[in-house]
Design a protein with these regions (language model features):
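Mid-domain alpha/beta scaffold segments of enzyme catalytic cores
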Residues: 1-237
Length: 237
């Protein structure tokens, strides 16, 4: 990486549902995640993603056309969050979630934008759908909570993973043990604050760098390059 590229790298908060005091800071790039019944519309000029969260798919008031229109805006960098959540339904009710998820997959493909994915205990289903749509846009699993083998399988399939604060806050989360016990290939790795507006994304970078024994500037540069690859564009500072 050239010195110019290094100087332009930012701390990336790939996914958050809160307003961010750092969103105007030249050293930070925050992507606000909009879901119709969870939070407010993005502010003018703000980078964002838009989608129908699995928790809200039964709400008849949701306008899928409105979400589609938002996703077509230039400041919308990703489609979603959308996905599958086994914790709120039994297996027989996953079908409705899957149909809505497929709608998002097709929309992301149509717009040629990455898809950010909500996954709770449905990784095998995510992999199946990933294989079912071979010519899809880039995918990201948000708040990833998996083992080393899960990370390696995602990297093999070119599915990106975004890590939230649970890898250093939780004593029981799988990702906490994975990060503590193994050296992680930074290919396709990102970080996020999710619902935690009380946490600075830089803190998450620093915690990961400390646990993985790498320089924070090297980590920052690598995640920036990951974002450029994810979006298929050259980002400017």
């Amino acid at each position: 990486m050239t010195s110019k590229e290094s100087q332009s790298a930012k701390f990336i908060d790939l996914h958050g549902h809160h307003s961010s005091s750092k969103s105007e800071d030249r050293d930070f790039l925050y992507i606000y995640s909009y879901s119709p019944k969870i939070n407010d519309l993005p502010e003018e000029g703000q980078f964002f993603s838009a989608g129908v969260h699995p928790w809200e798919i039964e709400d008849a008031r949701i306008s899928f056309e409105g979400v589609k229109r938002l996703c077509g805006e230039s400041n919308c960098l990703m489609v979603g969050e959308a996905g599958l959540d086994r914790s709120i339904v039994d297996d027989s009710d996953l079908e409705q979630q899957e149909e809505v998820f497929k709608w998002h997959i097709q929309l992301a493909n149509e717009l040629k934008k990455p898809l950010i994915i909500h996954n709770v205990k449905c990784l095998s289903e995510i992999f199946r759908l990933h294989k079912q749509y071979p010519n899809h846009s880039n995918w990201v699993l948000h708040d990833f909570n998996g083992s080393l083998s899960d990370i390696q399988e995602c990297q093999k399939r070119s599915i990106a993973m975004s890590l939230g604060p649970r890898f250093y806050e939780s004593q029981t989360a799988r990702i906490a043990h994975t990060i503590s016990d193994h050296k992680i290939d930074l290919n396709l790795i990102f970080f996020e604050t999710d619902e935690r507006g009380d946490i600075n994304i830089q803190t998450i970078y620093e915690k990961f760098a400390q646990k993985q024994e790498i320089e924070i500037d090297d980590l920052k540069d690598r995640i920036w390059q990951n974002l450029k690859a994810l979006l298929g564009t050259n980002l400017t500072s």
